[in-house]
Amino acid sequence: MELGFLRPLYDEIGDYVSVYLDTDRVHENAAEAIAIRWRNAWEQLSAAGADPASLGAVAEAIGDPDEVAAGQAVFARAGAVTFSGALDAPPRREIARLALLPHVMPLLAQHPPPIPHLRVSATRTGGEIVAIGGSGEGWRDWVAGRQWPVHKTSVGGWSQDRYQRSAEETWDENARALAAEVVAAAGRIGARHVIVGGDVRARSLLLEHLTKPLRESAAVVDEEVSADSQALAEAAGRALSQWADRDVRERFDDWRTQLAHGRGVQGLAPVMAAFRNGQVSDLFLADDPTSTATAWIGRAGNALAASEEELADWGVAEPVLDRADAALARAIAQTDAELHFLPEDLVERGDPAACGGITRPRDGVCATLRFSVEGG
């Protein structure tokens, strides 16, 4: 996943409040339970020296009556919420933390940002497009093609073939227009995936006119449904889950290959050194909610190291100790790398041969590099 949407969180750092709270309201006395949880978090953060204004901003976000999520992750500094995320289940661990950096990794693991994609309902007169971007933004558009002739005549005679050809030409023309809008929309939001429903013939024609990458990644729903229908949304969820799983496995396979050629590293210290050099393309991380690994960091996004001495040698005057995963998240966001959580079966196998000789990357972290040091 790309983390560019988190970049504004790092415009200013220091005294960051990170709160993960169970806000499930389906149980009896839920409001009272939430209030108790938040009071405990408030006391913990106050004791750590958190800014009262920042705590007030978090309290306002958590107490929002319009927010009905089962869990919330809220990040604040200098008296303002900088980012918040709704969880569809209570957080795996309730967290109340004050640190230099926001602790975003649990949010990314439990509620990753949407995969940019398009949902399309094709008709013989055009179609409907729903676009979902990587930060959750969405929009809807309609493509209106030619309205006549779209029906084949059942009347015999010398003109029947001409009417049928005209109708088919109209369908094809409308499919081309819809395909052009789909391709343009995909480019605007960076989508590589499209889910297509609608009229059988219109779906087929649309797929013919899509670009090869979109056509090959398309998932088809064999129903005449609207682009914003529940059926298409559910189909999109299944397809995107399959695509994401396949993508991380293919990229991890590539990492194992690159490791042997100097274009891959594993372990916290080598990965952080690669970030300092601007080398990291893809970071792979074993999802471990219990991790307590730390890193030394500076003000710059790529200022992170396993030891204070390394950062001092790199020119950072006053390194500060913070969570390693918080430092990695910032480095990913600010260097245009991508984050991938490794499926459990890739890091828990007992047979090294099944995983290219590697059952688990050292420290649960590894990276594919844009270039090797030798290659410049």
Where are these regions (language model features)?
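Terminal alpha-helical anchor/extension segments at protein ends
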Residues: 1-376
